[in-house]
Amino acid sequence: MKDLFGQAILDYQTNNFPEDLYTETSISELDVMPIDYLFRDYKEMPSLEKKALDLVKGKTLDVGCGAGSHALYLQEKNIDVLAIDISPKAVKACQLRGVKDVKVINFLDLDESVKYDTILFLMNGTGIFQNLLLINVYLDKIKKLLNDNGQVLIDGTDIIYMFDEDEDGGKWIPSNGNYYGELDFTVHYKGEIDETINWLYLDFETLKNACEYHQLNCTKVKTEEDSYLAKITL
């Protein structure tokens, strides 16, 4: 991985001739992602993210922290928050921004002896699951990291709206055998192209069913068009 996402974040933070990111998926063409959007403050955040941050309690883990905007807001609210990301460059930018506790680590590699009251997966938090099969691995890890009264706050989007309808109102979905939200995701930055990764857009009912299989409770907290914020508890 070239870590172009992290490079864009670090370039913006250090004023190193930053440019916008471009992303594409297996069902969508190149789309611009303004880099300053990753540096937004609370009042500029979508309502789902605001709601999630309002619900945070206790010792908190911010997974896939990116530029650290959520962690910074929680710090200001005197929340004990650990921010993590697999991008060393994004973590460096977080440190420069003033995030106090931020580490380069994969969520699945976290020490299970340390428990959390809140675990955040935001900005299409279900993406980290990659595909339907790996959801089981992540939910199992979540169970080991949550305190008894802890919560996971995760947002996701049902992308069924991106597929064409037939005359009967049904959706034309490619018959490759995969779940329609399992996409290939590619980042472009400054003329370079990063390695394609797997990214999961997950509808709420599928998330809920997966949670129930693992004896986890999953409730929908808030919806916004085709996106939702869910709360997962033991």
Model-derived features: where do they sit?
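A short SAM/SAH-binding and catalytic strip from SAM-dependent methyltransferases
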Residues: 116-136
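Conserved SAM-binding strand-loop segment of SAM-dependent methyltransferases
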Residues: 98-109
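Conserved class I S-adenosyl-L-methionine
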Residues: 57-66
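SAM-dependent methyltransferase
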Residues: 148-206
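Conserved SAM/SAH-binding beta-strand->alpha-helix loop
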Residues: 87-88
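A short glycine-rich, Lys/Arg-flanked "PGG" loop and its adjoining helix->strand segment in the class I
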Residues: 135-148
